[in-house]
Every structure is written in C-alpha cells, then in structure tokens.
C-alpha cells in the first residue's frame, strides 16, 4: 500500500537539472545546436569533477567525525573540522561559478545579457503562491 501511495506516475517525473538548463539555454538565451553540444560536453566534464569532489567531501566528513570522536570533540578538533569543511565548500563553490562562466563563454555577444539576467532567475526562482 505504501508503495502505491508514494509512487509518482511517470508523466509527472521531475526534469533533470541538465534538461532544465538545456531548456533555459535554448529558449531563454537562444542557444543553437552547436552551442548546446558545447554545453553537453562541458556538463559531462563538470559532472565528473563534482563527483570527485563529492566523494572527497564524504571521505572528509568521515575523517572529521573520526578525529572529533577520538579527541572527545575538543575545541581544536572542532575548529579543524570546521576549517576542512569550509575549504571543501569553497572548492565546490569555485567549481560551480567556474562552470557558469564557461557556459557564459559559449554565448555570443547578443546572448550574454540574456544569460546574465536569466541565470539568477533560473537558480533562484520564487515559489508560486498556493
């Protein structure tokens, strides 16, 4: 019974982030087929980089908790864990914004203003009121 209640029909399946971005680039920015192909290639490279970073984050989190446990959650161990986590978050943010810049570099001069004004809306669109 629980499976039936919580199973979503295929027609309402969520669109992947990649597909949403492709639609944005095609419909809002005006990408052509060659530009979309460049984006696809860039996406694959970015996805591999993010996977490596996420694996590193998981390993780092495990290590942080081990160090915290072994030290009895000392102030210095907590500070070290915070510093490691912050550095990993900086790397993730850097990868994200570098990818946006690389996508922007695929745009021609006419498309760049549309990308610049639309990208924030793409990532931070307001929820519709119910």
Annotate each language-model stretch with its function.
Residues 17-84:
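Extracytoplasmic/periplasmic/luminal assembly and interaction segments
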Residues 41, 62-130:
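Non-cytosolic head/periplasmic domains of membrane-anchored proteins
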Residues 9-28, 96, 100-101:
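Extended, structured, electrostatic nucleic-acid-contact surfaces
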Residues 1-17, 127-130:
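Classical N-terminal targeting signals for secretion and organelle import
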Residues 1-2, 30-32, 37, 108, ...:
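Proteins with a high burden of low-complexity, intrinsically disordered sequence enriched in S/T/G/P/A and R
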């Amino acid at each position: 019974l629980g499976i039936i209640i919580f199973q979503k029909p295929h027609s309402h399946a969520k669109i992947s982030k990649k597909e949403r971005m492709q639609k944005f680039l095609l419909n809002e920015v005006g990408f052509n087929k060659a530009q979309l192909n460049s984006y696809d290639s860039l996406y694959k490279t970015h996805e591999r980089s993010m996977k490596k970073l996420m694996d590193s984050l998981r390993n780092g989190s495990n290590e942080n908790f081990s160090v915290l446990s072994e030290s009895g959650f000392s102030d210095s161990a907590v500070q070290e864990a915070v510093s490691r986590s912050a550095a990993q978050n900086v790397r993730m943010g850097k990868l994200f914004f570098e990818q946006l810049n690389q996508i922007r570099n695929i745009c021609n001069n006419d498309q760049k203003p549309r990308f610049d004004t639309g990208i924030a809306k793409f990532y931070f669109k307001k929820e519709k009121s119910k």
